[in-house]
């Protein structure tokens, strides 16, 4: 699914056959994260990947779980939803999660799809969660990005 500002990367059915993918999603803001989680799993399975899934409490718990999964899986997808509140907590959480997910991928060499929404309002999250009439599907996008990157890394390793 192509969106304004998002690369038009698509996976062919079966292109990830034999690949293992972990989908780890926060439980906080479950009306949003449940959709992100389900859509990430669906995208990975459509590509032929073997999927394992877990839930953690909130976005701050994602980096450590993702780092552990990076040791055992070909690609990892992290989903969550952080909505701006009245304090600096939003910025602190967003920065920590983004840094942690990026570090997990860089330290391990395993692609991490970042499906953590960082939005000002619940309505913005709904528009990005892939539901009916949503403008975007960030859960699917994160899975596709992680799997596509894993496939590119395989090509690089083979010198193709």
UniProtKB/Swiss-Prot annotation:
Record's catalysed reaction(s): (2S)-2-hydroxy-3-oxobutyl phosphate + 5-amino-6-(D-ribitylamino)uracil = 6,7-dimethyl-8-(1-D-ribityl)lumazine + phosphate + 2 H2O + H(+)
Keywords: Riboflavin biosynthesis, Transferase
GO biological process: riboflavin biosynthetic process
Record: residues binding (2S)-2-hydroxy-3-oxobutyl phosphate: 86-87, 128
EC assignment: 2.5.1.78
Active site: 89
Cellular component GO terms held in the UniProt record: cytosol; riboflavin synthase complex
Pathway info: Cofactor biosynthesis; riboflavin biosynthesis; riboflavin from 2-hydroxy-3-oxobutyl phosphate and 5-amino-6-(D-ribitylamino)uracil: step 1/2
Gene Ontology molecular function terms on file: 6,7-dimethyl-8-ribityllumazine synthase activity
Residues reported in the UniProt entry to bind 5-amino-6-(D-ribitylamino)uracil: 28, 59-61, 81-83, 114
Highest taxon above the source species: Bacteria
Function as written in the Swiss-Prot or TrEMBL entry: Catalyzes the formation of 6,7-dimethyl-8-ribityllumazine by condensation of 5-amino-6-(D-ribitylamino)uracil with 3,4-dihydroxy-2-butanone 4-phosphate. This is the penultimate step in the biosynthesis of riboflavin.
Annotated family: Belongs to the DMRL synthase family.
Protein name: 6,7-dimethyl-8-ribityllumazine synthase
């Amino acid at each position: 699914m192509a969106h304004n500002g998002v690369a038009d990367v698509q996976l062919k059915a079966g292109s990830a056959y034999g690949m293992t993918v972990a989908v780890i999603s926060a439980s906080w803001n479950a009306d949003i994260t449940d959709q992100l989680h389900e859509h990430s799993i669906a995208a990975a399975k459509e590509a032929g990947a073997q999927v394992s899934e877990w839930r953690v409490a909130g976005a701050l718990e994602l980096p450590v779980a993702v780092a552990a999964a990076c040791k055992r899986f070909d690609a990892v997808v992290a989903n969550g939803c952080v909505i701006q509140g009245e304090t600096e907590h939003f910025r602190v959480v967003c920065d920590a999660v983004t840094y942690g997910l990026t570090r997990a991928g860089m330290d391990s060499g395993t692609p991490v799809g970042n499906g953590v929404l960082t939005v000002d309002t619940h309505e913005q999250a709904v528009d990005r969660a892939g539901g009916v009439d949503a403008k975007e599907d960030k859960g699917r996008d994160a899975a596709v990005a992680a799997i596509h990157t894993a496939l590119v890394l395989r090509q690089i390793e083979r010198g193709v």
